[in-house]
Amino acid sequence: MVEPLLSGIVLGMITVSAFGLFVAAFLQYRRGNQFEI
């Protein structure tokens, strides 16, 4: 009974953390480009 809930939480955490890393990298990349110009 608990395993589906646990796997769902783990998948959600992985998705959110991956999305957060992508957004942070994108913002840092844009900020670097603005500094260069």
UniProtKB/Swiss-Prot annotation:
Span of the secretion signal?
none
Q: Where is it localised?
A: Plastid, Chloroplast thylakoid membrane
Q: Does the keyword Transmembrane apply?
A: yes
Listed transmembrane segments: 5-25
So what does this one do?
Component of the cytochrome b6-f complex, which mediates electron transfer between photosystem II (PSII) and photosystem I (PSI), cyclic electron flow around PSI, and state transitions. PetG is required for either the stability or assembly of the cytochrome b6-f complex.
Family classification: Belongs to the PetG family.
What is the recorded name of this protein?
Cytochrome b6-f complex subunit 5
